[in-house]
Regions:
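Hydrophobic alpha-helical transmembrane segments of integral membrane proteins
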Residues: 105-124, 190-212
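Membrane-interface helix-boundary signature
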Residues: 11-27, 63-69, 96-106, 147-153, ...
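An N-terminus-focused feature that recognizes amino-terminal "leader" regions
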Residues: 2-78, 99, 266
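Membrane-helix interface motif
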Residues: 39-51, 121-138, 217-228
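Hydrophobic, ordered structural segments
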Residues: 15-16, 34, 38, 64-175, ...
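Cytoplasmic juxtamembrane regions at transmembrane-helix boundaries
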Residues: 3, 87-109, 172-197, 266-271
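C-terminal functional regions that serve as terminal interaction/effector modules
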Residues: 2-8, 19, 29-38, 71, ...
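Short, membrane-exposed interhelical loops at transmembrane-helix boundaries
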Residues: 51-61, 140-144, 187-190, 194, ...
């Protein structure tokens, strides 16, 4: 055991980190509420903002005191990065052997996801992130395609995203997410409401992520980088299907439910 490990474990168990996580979850919830709202607006014919994290930040920045709000969201997301990094280094002590390693790797991967969102928020707050979106995913896909076996790398990324989305659907269907709420947060009418928000939200977010993965996989299989895209492109694709607006409104409302569940989790946090 290194000298830093006891200190790291103490920080991982601290009330201060609990407060940081709560702040971060509120920020994460705000992002999902905005994405859900933009998805519904897209279904209703408003294409002024992308239904993505970047579009959500841009929409928030346009509100009164918007720049301050986006900076606040960015700080919250960086706090989530810090939490997951600490968890990856010192957490999951109740698990043993390979299971502990797996859980710490998952925590590290989540830190990367939160970091990407935090950087997006920082760019928008600094005035440099209003564009991009799906075109950036297409550019990244094109660069990957140029690598040896790049076509299969892109397809593998797509399959990984599908798997990630599937994990959200599974957690929603089985109510596995309930373990992140303290007992009080699962009891009574309010607890039932929180669980319903979590179930709908996890399934909707999982389906949206899976659709992003399908686009990446299709781009890899067909060797067409333009077929890939981020969340906005995935929702645009859904919109073009039969009954697309109805399905998109349902997905948008579900993603908003995930945002509300993040607020509930912040209130009744059980790490």
């Amino acid at each position: 055991m290194t000298e830093a490990e006891p200190l790291g474990r103490q920080v991982e168990r601290s009330d201060l980190l609990d407060h940081a996580v709560r702040i971060g979850l509120v920020a994460y919830g705000v992002v999902h509420l905005l994405i859900g709202w933009l998805a519904v607006q897209l279904a209703l014919g408003d294409h002024s903002e992308q239904a993505s994290a970047q579009g959500a930040m841009a929409a928030l920045a346009q509100q009164p005191f918007g720049e301050v709000l986006v900076w606040a969201v960015a700080v919250g997301l960086y706090l989530l990065v810090l939490w997951r990094l600490i968890e990856a280094a010192f957490g999951h002590r109740d698990a043993e052997g390979g299971n502990r390693v797996r859980k710490r790797l998952v925590s590290g991967a989540k830190a990367v996801v939160y970091l990407a969102l935090a950087v997006t928020a920082t760019r928008v707050a600094a005035g440099g992130g209003s564009g991009g979106g799906s075109s950036s995913e297409e550019t990244l896909t094109a660069k990957l395609m140029d690598l040896p076996a790049g076509q299969w790398i892109v397809a593998a990324v797509g399959l990984a995203i599908i798997g990630y989305g599937g994990s959200y659907v599974w957690r929603g269907w089985t109510e596995k997410f309930g373990e992140h709420l303290e007992t009080e947060g699962r009891l009574g009418w309010s607890g039932a409401g929180y669980m319903l928000l979590g179930q709908v939200g996890h399934i909707a977010k999982g389906l949206a992520l899976a659709l992003v993965g399908v686009l990446f996989t299709y781009a890899g299989v067909t060797h067409e980088s333009g077929k890939s895209g981020g969340l906005d492109e995935a929702l645009q694709t859904l919109l073009r299907q039969p009954f697309g607006p109805v399905m998109l409104i349902a997905i948008g409302a579900g993603i908003a439910c995930f945002g509300l569940f993040c607020f509930a989790r912040a209130r009744h946090l059980d790490r």
